[in-house]
């Protein structure tokens, strides 16, 4: 057991199962990340990595009205799960990812790219998926020594933004639990 201040406790009603309530923490991270990156209606979104958290990002993007939602995932089972979670398109060939993203976004690139894996090569690739004025959500954790090469002038001239997000806070926890209790996520 751990003693914590009462203000940090979120009471659960009987209507929410423990198996659902335990998802509050990871969903709170996704809730916070969506707010930090400013995800909004009708924006195109690319989610790199359709593991559990990547699929949470897909569901949040759908809930917020993003369109199209594009997942990039090599694993066939995870690719299918991404479709079930709300991805409009799933790209399974990394060699054709940029070409397909451009085709799905009328040649512009994505408004928002979410890297949810934490692999340096995928971060490099994510930078190429953004449209001018686009935003990259750095969500996938790397080790402390990981570095990626960027071209600052390209980011400046294209007015792009890179935003990090790591953990949900109090309000995010409450919002995540509210959404879970109203069955907004599968």
Predicted regions and their residues:
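Glycine- and other small-residue-rich loops at beta-strand/loop junctions that grip anionic moieties
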Residues: 1, 22, 46, 50, ...
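Glycine-rich phosphate/adenylate-binding loop and adjacent beta-alpha elements
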Residues: 1-9
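Glycine/charged-rich beta-loop-alpha catalytic/anionic-binding loops adjacent to active sites
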Residues: 8-18, 79, 158-159
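A general structural signal for well-ordered alpha-helical segments in protein cores
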Residues: 9, 27-30, 54, 110, ...
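Structural detector of well-ordered beta-strand residues that form the stable sheet scaffold
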Residues: 10, 46, 70, 91, ...
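Mid-domain Rossmann-like dinucleotide-binding core that forms the NAD(H)/NADP(H) cofactor-binding site
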Residues: 17-95
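Glycine-rich cofactor phosphate-binding loops and adjacent beta1-alpha1 units
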Residues: 37, 80-81, 85-159
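C-terminal substrate-binding/catalytic core of Rossmann-like NAD(P)-dependent dehydrogenases/reductases
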Residues: 102-103, 144-186
């Amino acid at each position: 057991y751990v003693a914590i201040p009462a203000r940090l406790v979120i009471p659960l009603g009987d209507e929410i199962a423990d198996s659902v309530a335990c998802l509050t923490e990871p969903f709170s991270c996704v809730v916070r990340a969506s707010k930090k990156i400013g995800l909004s209606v009708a924006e195109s979104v690319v989610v790199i990595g359709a593991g559990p958290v990547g699929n949470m990002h897909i569901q949040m993007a759908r809930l917020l009205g993003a369109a199209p939602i594009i997942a990039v995932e090599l694993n066939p089972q995870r690719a299918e799960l991404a479709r079930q979670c709300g991805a409009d398109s799933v790209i399974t060939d990394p060699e054709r990812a940029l070409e397909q993203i451009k085709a799905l976004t009328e040649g512009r690139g994505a408004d928002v790219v979410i890297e949810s894996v934490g692999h340096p090569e995928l971060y490099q690739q994510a930078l190429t998926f953004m449209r001018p004025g686009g935003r990259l959500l750095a969500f996938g954790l790397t080790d402390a020594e990981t570095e990626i090469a960027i071209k600052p002038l390209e980011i400046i001239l294209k007015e792009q933004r890179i935003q990090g997000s790591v953990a949900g806070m109090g309000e995010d926890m409450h919002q995540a639990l509210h959404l879970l209790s109203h069955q907004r996520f599968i």
